[in-house]
Amino acid sequence: LEKSRREEQMKRIEKGTPGYLDYKKKVEIIRTVIYFLLVAAIFTLGYVQTKTRSNLLTVVAILGCLPAAKALVGVITRFPYASVDQKLVHEVTKAPHTTRVYDLVLTTREKIMPVECVVISNGTVFGYTDSKKVDLNVLSKHIRDMMTQNRLSYSTVKFYQDYKVFLSRIEGLESIAMVENAKINGEEEAQTRQLLLNLSM
């Protein structure tokens, strides 16, 4: 039972699904530790064999610091952001006729903007972030601009920091989708979801 539990914990979580950010942080922490241990092992081996730091393995160890440092930057960048709360996931799951994406960390040249959830349905995009540091106008404009560049047309793109307001908007989207009984723009919604994933760390 314990073995199966550990295997379940290490099971790959796809980008855009609940739990991805926490999973990705664990993977990158493990990868970073392994990289630095390998660098240390290579350097130590070279020093033990030659009794000097001026050897080929030292050069290899120095070069190995580059991917190790890159992995460390990934850990540091993602570390402040946690996966979406399961309570929100449970509430949004009540809108099964919509397209959903979770655990986003959207980036521009100047900003890093965490977004817990985005719901897409029939020409409308609603998103939620609990970070008060995120400028909602900047975030909405960035997503609209990216959609325009990718020839995706939406009448409404809006993000919220108010949990209850966001849920009420999602409830409204679900009601409309249920009445229509089908996704009018299913392919475009899938493309929009993929765009958001591409824009996210």
Where are these regions (language model features)?
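Surface-exposed interaction regions that form or flank ligand-binding interfaces
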Residues: E2-T99, L139-K141, T148-S155, D162-M201
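Active-site metal-binding core of divalent-cation-utilizing nuclease and nuclease-like domains
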Residues: H97-V115
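Structural signal for conserved beta-strand scaffold positions within catalytic alpha/beta enzyme cores
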Residues: Y102, G127, F159-Q161
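Active-site beta-strand-loop-beta-strand hairpin of nuclease catalytic cores
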Residues: V115-F126
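Short beta-strand-loop-alpha-helix junction that forms the active-site gateway
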Residues: T129-V134
